[in-house]
UniProtKB/Swiss-Prot annotation:
Localization per record: Cell inner membrane
InterPro entries hit by this protein: UPF0761_bac (IPR023679), Virul_fac_BrkB (IPR017039)
Membrane topology: Multi-pass membrane protein
Protein name listed in UniProt: UPF0761 membrane protein Sbal_0315
Record field: transmembrane: 4-24, 45-65, 102-122, 137-157, 182-202, 213-233, 247-267
Entry keyword set: Cell inner membrane, Cell membrane, Membrane, Transmembrane, Transmembrane helix
Highest taxon above the source species: Bacteria
Length: 323
């Protein structure tokens, strides 16, 4: 009897995962995340130079970040633009240098284009969450401006704090010396989880549960790390883009990677948004199942006052059918 109930609970668990995946698949098809990712990739490439220009300007305003600007650039390009990071860094730094020499009107235009990217991200994620209530123009602009100005500062502060922790003498001890390479290797993964978690909790214009956002962030971060390694391996081992495009190969490589990155970001958002929908549906189904199965549960337990969980009810049904 106990073994049958345990097997039934395992079946319920895997069946629940399967039903969630089916629900997620329907959501992905309905939301057309491939089209959304393409739109965001286009806006990202259009806004890339303005975003970098604004970011570097914000970091330059704080003397503490001037000495580590090269480290910040290297960390970003190495971990977020695999296989083409060095080439892209050279071009973007040149473009940013040219952009910084522009007039006040030109710099204002760069800020507007950078805000366009943040606005596109905001609209895409809120559409995934089926958010009906929109933010006011003042609130939306304030949030975009805060992300644009405080975002680079927070990233720089995180890297400074990480560098400080790594330089502590505590890591020089023999017992902890082996932990340093592991910590450094896991640092990009930790940053990815933190960034996705913040994105999924702050951007939607509704309350998002921490555990749901954490699940989506972990899945997105894992896919992002695997995607970086897989894409870098493909570009280096199968240089078809270089054979076709020659010196212009960097352009399609960057576009494809940005597109894949947005697919991963939106997939994590879909997982986060689908969790409460699925759990609410399962809860209502469990209540109905428990109500219909009460006579069977009473007959099996011999106690009319017993309260059974949905898994126990399902298990008892399976036992009753087998008997």
């Amino acid at each position: 009897m106990t073994k049958k109930i345990e097997l039934a609970q395992i079946r319920v668990l895997f069946l629940g995962i399967w039903h969630f995946l089916l629900h997620l698949r329907r959501r992905l098809v309905e939301d057309q995340i491939n089209i959304r990712a393409g739109h965001l990739a286009y806006v990202t490439l259009l806004s890339l130079v303005p975003m970098v220009a604004v970011t570097m300007s914000m970091l330059s305003a704080f003397p503490v970040f001037k000495g580590i600007r090269g480290q910040i650039e290297g960390f970003v390009y190495e971990n977020f633009l695999p296989a083409a990071g060095d080439t892209v860094q050279v071009y973007i730094n040149e473009f940013v240098g040219n952009a910084s020499k522009g007039t006040a009107v030109g710099i204002a235009a760069l800020v507007v284009v950078a805000i366009m990217l943040i606005s596109a991200i905001d609209k895409s994620l809120n559409n995934i969450w089926r958010t009906k209530e929109k933010r006011s123009v003042v609130v939306a602009f304030s949030m975009y401006w805060m992300v644009l100005t405080l975002g680079p500062v927070l990233v720089g502060a995180s890297l400074v704090a990480s560098s400080y922790v790594i330089s502590l003498k505590v890591f020089e001890a023999e017992a902890l010396s082996g932990m340093l390479p592991i910590f450094i290797a896991r640092l990009p993964m930790l940053f990815s989880v933190a960034a996705f978690l913040l994105l999924y909790m702050v951007v939607p214009n509704q309350k998002v549960k921490f555990l749901h956002a954490l699940l989506g962030a972990i899945v997105a971060a894992l896919l992002f790390e695997l995607g970086k390694k897989g894409f870098a391996l493909y570009v280096t081992q199968f240089p078809s883009y270089e054979a076709i495009y020659g010196a212009l190969a960097t352009i399609p490589i960057v576009f494809v990677w940005v597109y894949l990155s947005w697919m991963i970001v939106l997939l994590g958002a879909e997982i986060t948004a689908a969790m409460p929908e699925y759990l609410d549906y399962e809860s209502s189904s469990d209540d109905e199942t428990a109500l219909n199965a009460k006579p069977l549960a009473d007959a099996s337990q011999g106690d009319s006052s017993s309260v059974l969980t949905s898994a126990e009810v399902t298990a008892l049904k399976a036992v009753a059918k087998s008997e």
